Amino acid sequence: LFLCNSGAEANENALKLASFTTGRERVLAMHGAFHGRTSLAVAVTDNPAIQAPVNRTDKVTFTPLNDIEAMRTELRSGAYAAVIVEGIQGVSGIRVASDDFLRAVREECDATGTMMILDEVQSGYGRSGRFFSHQWAGVRPDIISMAKGIGNGFPVGAIMISPAIPARTGMLGTTFGGSHLACAAAIAVADVMKSENLVENARVMGEKIVAAIKDVSGVSDIRGRGLMIGVDLAVPQAEFRKVLMSHHHIMTGYSGKNTLRLLPPLMIGDREVERFAKAFRATA
């Protein structure tokens, strides 16, 4: 385990570690990916608008999420240090990496000596109804990056590293990562998640939200896992969100012109689900 401060820093170190370990310099990332705004993290983010000229590189290739053949074609070149993939893409609208795709990535990484990096910064720490979203597929990545939920708002990031990857003194470093206060916050969060069974609660409440709104007129698609849900609307999301906020005091995220992103607290219960469903139906 390597402790740091943020998701971007976690992904920077995950990618750096993969390159150190394999001696290779290329990275395979997914269309729609978001991994952070710093040097390597933004280079593997599929958004040229937030890449400064200094961040742009020819060492990253993007293939479509869940396209097994495209992934295999790239990795079989033997040039890649790592594949980095979000278990559930958040910024691009809650796009779930399929179980079959993640299993195929694991198989191909094993065959080609490539590191499998799972970015669980947003989809981890119970949000999907499992502690990590990739656990739905039953795979074991080489490196897992995480942040956000670790400190429940306090800046804590980390990467979990396979014991098969050799450690070397000085290979990774951080100024503030793993401070006493950060660790105290992380331990407190873990204690509450365990005592209140919040991972299972996320799964159950997520299923209830989906069941409550999936047949509402104007919903064209709904997807996700646990309390990480994307809702495609037949109308622009901006006006829909404005009404939810001004009339019902409910805030949601969004992606693109028509997608709501629902990421409520893991501790919500039936009362909050019913309140949201009632407001959603009234707004639709």
Where are these regions (language model features)?
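Conserved N-terminal phosphate-binding loop of PLP-dependent enzymes in the Aspartate aminotransferase
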Residues: L1-A284
